[in-house]
Regions:
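N-terminal export leaders
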Residues: 1-2
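Hydrophobic helical h-region of N-terminal Sec-dependent signal peptides
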Residues: 5-6, 39
């Protein structure tokens, strides 16, 4: 579901020109008392942000219309603490609302990746993480057999 809808978001502006944001897309930026959301959909007619209590909740607890910027990004700011909530974007194209998607730049997702998760990245490191040191071995001496 999310992959198909996300692919539909990557497109051209209505005049055929490709509009690309200048900086890497920060889709969900948690700041405690507010969270900023953005999705790149330059040819969408409208976009909505939907917030859910859980990854599988049927009805959003908040739906917000998003505003289109000149860079093709639709943006919305939630002015409350929504840490732990899940989100989707829904865009309208050719008069039809497409399926909801977690977006193409979600850094954290819920069950099956269908919804993005609002995370405070400052709380994700385990105790002692900053002091952790990797093995002292030359990179040329490392052999990686399988990596996913």
């Amino acid at each position: 579901m999310g992959t198909i809808a996300a692919a539909a978001l990557v497109s051209c502006a209505s005049d055929g020109a490709i509009v690309v944001p200048e900086a890497p897309l920060e889709e969900c930026v948690y700041m405690g008392d507010k969270t900023e959301f953005a999705v790149w959909a330059p040819d969408a007619e409208a976009a909505q942000l939907k917030l859910y209590t859980t990854a599988q909740e049927e009805t959003p607890f908040k739906t917000m219309d998003m505003k289109l910027g000149k860079d093709g990004l639709w943006k919305a700011t939630v002015k409350e603490d929504v840490k732990g909530a899940f989100y989707t974007f829904q865009v309208q194209k050719n008069g039809q609302w497409l399926e909801e998607t977690a977006g193409i730049a979600a850094k954290a997702v819920g069950v099956n990746g269908t919804r993005g998760a609002v995370i405070d990245w400052n709380e994700t490191n385990p105790e002692g993480w900053a002091e952790d040191k990797g093995p002292k071995i030359a990179p040329s001496d490392i052999i990686v057999y399988e990596m996913h």
